[in-house]
Amino acid sequence: MLRQCDTRTLQWADKTMSVMRAEQLEACEKDLTGLPSRCLFEPECSNIDAEKLYELSFFADEDRSISGRALRPALHTVEQLRNRVLHTFVQECALLSVEEHDLLVRAVLFGGRISLNDWNELIPARALVRRLWCRVEGVGENAVLVMPHQLCASALLLLAGDSHKAVRNIVEQVHDSIENTLYLLGAAQAAGPARHMASLLKDTCVAGHPELITRFLLAGFDYVYDRSGNLLLIHPGLADPDKMMGITNTEMNPEALSKASDSINDLESPLYERMLGLLIDVTRPEITPEDAVEDLIILAKQEVPWKDMLEVLSSLLICQPTPEMRSALKDLSDRVPRWLGLSTSRVQ
């Protein structure tokens, strides 16, 4: 999802990963509010409804990109949009983001209507709405994802197919690779993962659909656009994407990436466990100890000064930091590996 918040003038306590994630979810909820109460594939959907849905859809962005300019005003009919959705439904179903696919499976199993029990599910739900497959009823704890029976029935047949499963294995492999890359670098040009994914898919039933690969990236990861208009995937905890604008296409083979991720995990795990043990039962009600420690680790990766790290820690607690906490934080601040993308972008 496009990064919504501008953090450049904020203090570090206001731009932790937890805070930025909450702002992303609030923006997502705002996007979903005010949409038509009908999905494109429901009988009551009108052409006026279809036009409103189109404006939020991936189709609108793709059409603007192809034309290279603002689109001429035109009413998109229900029939036209339904045909566009169904034309690539088989391929798109296989190329959903991991979180979208999880929601799709649940929706199919439960007859096209599921509660969004976790606020974090709003982002993949919004992506499914942008694909014009679903709608979301209600907000907050009462939010429900609704998928028309026509699409549920079609998806049910696809989910059981061997070709679908084969593509999903590739999708999950690429998803994990991108997540590891973002944790290592902080950001990555989308062109590299897109090329890699296309090469893995070239002999499958979904070959030749670069627009669906782009949708997968937009739906599955936080992103911004660099100064040249290129898609830049960013870690959800990266507070200032501008610092990464100079990052080049850094591609690592899966084996090297796996080894680097394992090495970082071996280094960070003891730091994480030590700090977590000290924060149990002393974090503010709105944040878990696990999220608090993760916030601190991600800040350390961005070379946040020790003084600011201590202020952030204080803001997360219901008490003053103890000497043990300060010592653990100093150790974490000194030893957590910095994001390679920060140093890479500085030399451009």
Please annotate each region the language model reported.
Residues 150-184, 239-264:
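Short, amphipathic alpha-helical interaction segments positioned at domain boundaries
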Residues 200, 204-311:
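Long, charge-rich C-terminal accessory regions
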